[in-house]
A protein has these predicted regions:
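Inter-Walker segment of RecA-like/P-loop motor cores
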Residues: 1-31, 143
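Catalytic micro-motifs at enzyme active sites that drive phosphoryl/nucleotidyl and oxygen chemistry
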Residues: 21-23, 43-47, 161-163
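Short, well-ordered loop/turn elements at secondary-structure boundaries
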Residues: 28-29, 51-54, 167-169
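Walker B catalytic acidic pair
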Residues: 36-38
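ASCE P-loop NTPase helicase motor core
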Residues: 40-126
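ATPase catalytic-site recognition across NTP-hydrolyzing enzymes
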Residues: 113-169
């Protein structure tokens, strides 16, 4: 219970890693719902919880753009006019579902993390191979899914060993 000057507010903290935990929210109505990493949350949970709240706030890391959370929620939001230029045009083009009035989309990139010193930021960037899915998602902040080769630096001549070469070992 959070006590304000005028009234008490009840705060529920629920996990969504399994249905038994989040089903505790059923039957309730909530003023504000916060879902961290909505892109990995169970979609049944997201749908059920979202319909029970007045205000939904969610975070996510870029993921497979074909996940239902994008078509049902994220791509129905729009950036505020004064922040449109902050987002990559690639992502703005994906906000293609009919807009929901009042649904706002905010874009934050790796550069917005004020807790990182320039040195720490560079250390993290240098530890992620450029051209990989994780670089695109985590460093550039763009959506994407793994397709084709898992490692873009894969070289068949260098990384594939023939049976004959194995026998020689």
């Amino acid at each position: 219970v959070f006590r304000t000057g005028a009234e008490d507010k009840i705060i529920y903290v629920l996990g969504y890693d399994n249905k038994a935990r989040w089903k505790k929210a059923l039957g309730g109505q909530y003023g504000c719902l916060y879902i961290d990493e909505i892109n990995i949350a169970d979609m049944e949970y997201v749908r059920e919880a979202a319909m029970r709240c007045d205000y939904l706030l969610a975070t996510l890391n870029p993921d497979d753009p074909n996940l239902p959370v994008y078509s049902e929620y994220i791509n129905r939001s729009r950036p505020l006019p004064e922040y449109v230029d902050d987002a990559p045009t690639e992502l703005l083009g994906m906000l293609s579902e009919p807009a929901k009035p009042g649904w706002v989309w905010w874009y934050f990139s790796f550069d917005h993390n004020a807790a990182l010193t320039p040195e720490k930021r560079q250390q993290i960037i240098s530890n992620v191979p450029a051209g990989t899915k994780i670089y695109k998602n985590k460093i550039l902040g763009l959506r994407g899914r793994a397709t084709g080769l898992v490692f873009s630096n894969f070289d068949r001549k260098r990384h594939v060993i023939s049976k004959a070469a194995i026998r020689k070992r």
